Amino acid sequence: MVDLNCDMGEGFGIYSFADDEEIMPFIDAANVACGFHASDPNTMRKTVELAKKYNVKVGSHPAYPDLVGFGRRPMKMKREEIKNLVMYQTGAIKAFLDEFDMPLNHIKPHGSLYGVSAKEEDVANGIADAAEIFNVGIFGMVNTFHEKVYKERGVKFYGEFYSDLEYDETGYLVIAKGRNQYYPTDRAVERCMRAMKENKVQTIQGNDVDVGCETICVHSDTPNAIEILKALREYISPKKNSSEKSTNGNHSKMPYIIAVSYTHLRAHETD
């Protein structure tokens, strides 16, 4: 079974971030912003309702309380504060899920919370503390405290690969200023295929590093995101209960998740 996951609901008030409904038919799971880096109650409810319409599972997308900075700025917080932060936001999205009789599927930290938790054990443990309360898994990066902490504690861990971002020699993501750039579809697909088969990716320095590939992330702010998604679907698997069918029969049984992200935040700061 193949799941496809996307960061969604990241507009607020009269401001929109991306066309959620355009991408929703391609995905199986949505990480919904919970109000701290983006979104508001009306947007959260609308996004959950849209997910139900397209039979999409929903997870929370908690962040540092940084609406102005879109959750991109790290904050110094104790483990208990991180736990409470994630519980508060996840509880908010779960309230809307309860209204639509939908379960909470997972947690995927956003932006700097994702990046800091990859490097700092206490932060990763704070997120795991919250995940245990909700009894759900977490999306993250292999060979970081994401994998170490979550696996040691028995929290389900999904190793994530990014199709449209480069990696450095340490295995962290490289984000340049003005990230909303076209990423060649063929290259994105080629990198994903190698990651799935070998769990490797070539870095910007030219060496290979190990990567996880249970979930593949495509950012919605990549101008050709839909093109990349369609190409990946052809190689990997059609969405369940979708009219989108793969022409590559053998690939349809590959057990991977495609993750489409509406964020471009990272575990490795480059500016």
Predicted features, each with a name:
Residues T263-T270:
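Conserved small/polar residues in nucleotide/adenosyl-binding loops
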